[in-house]
Each structure stands twice: as C-alpha cells, then as structure tokens.
From Swiss-Prot:
Transmembrane segments: none annotated. This is Large ribosomal subunit protein bL19. This protein is located at the 30S-50S ribosomal subunit interface and may play a role in the structure and function of the aminoacyl-tRNA binding site. Keywords: Ribonucleoprotein, Ribosomal protein. HAMAP family: Ribosomal_bL19. Belongs to the bacterial ribosomal protein bL19 family. It comes from the Bacteria. Signal peptide: none annotated. The lineage of its organism: Bacteria, Pseudomonadati, Pseudomonadota, Gammaproteobacteria, Pseudomonadales.
Length: 116
C-alpha cells in the first residue's frame, strides 16, 4: 500500500496539462534550454517510439532524423524542462514500442496516418 503523503505529493507534481499521444504519433516538444544567462525554447519534433506510464515517473522517447543521422531523446513527461507538447500527426501502428524503426531508413521508416 502506497503512503497517502507520497500520493499527495505525486498528484501535486502532475498538474501539467499533457495532450493524449501514443507511439507512432508525431509530436513537437518545446524544451527550455539555458545558454549562459539567457533561456530560450527549443523545438524537438519527431515520432514517439516508446511511452512509459508510471504516474509522476512517466517518460516517452522521441526519434527524429537530423542531417541524415537518427537522434533519439527521452523526456520525463512531467519535467519542468518541458514547456509544451503538441501532437502534429496521429500514426497508425500495432506495436507499443517502435524500436524496429532504428534499423529502417528513408521510405521504409514511414508510418501510416491514422484515419479518424
């Protein structure tokens, strides 16, 4: 049984509004980046290849191709470093973890769009 105090603290930290997204979706994550004394927002757009739902410990992994090189970044869902998230495109996939996309390139790595 989880302690009521821990549950209350976790509920307090999970107040951020998160859009519903799933593996296969293309999302844009606005990340707060601090360079020296000034802060700015950096957009990271890519396909969600994994999602982990564990309350305040939830995380998701986004993959994009930058200059012909695959770049993956794992974000903590309720991190204060994330300013905002937006779903650009819904993907139609049948798996929860899309790690097989790491081995594919070009047209083979495309994901069908979900028709709804």
């Amino acid at each position: 049984m989880t302690n009521k105090i821990i549950l209350a603290l976790e509920a307090e930290q999970m107040t951020k509004e998160i859009p519903t997204f799933a593996p296969g979706d293309t999302i844009v994550v606005q990340v707060k980046v601090k360079e020296g004394d000034r802060a700015r927002l950096q957009a990271f757009e890519g396909v969600v290849i994994a999602k982990r739902n564990r309350g305040v410990n939830s995380a998701f992994t986004v993959r994009k191709i930058s200059n012909g090189v695959g770049v993956e970044r794992t974000f903590q869902t309720y991190s204060p470093q994330i300013d905002s998230m937006a779903v650009k495109r819904r993907g139609d996939v049948r798996k929860a973890k899309l790690y097989y996309l790491r081995d594919l390139s070009g047209k083979a790595a495309r994901i069908k769009e979900k028709l709804s």
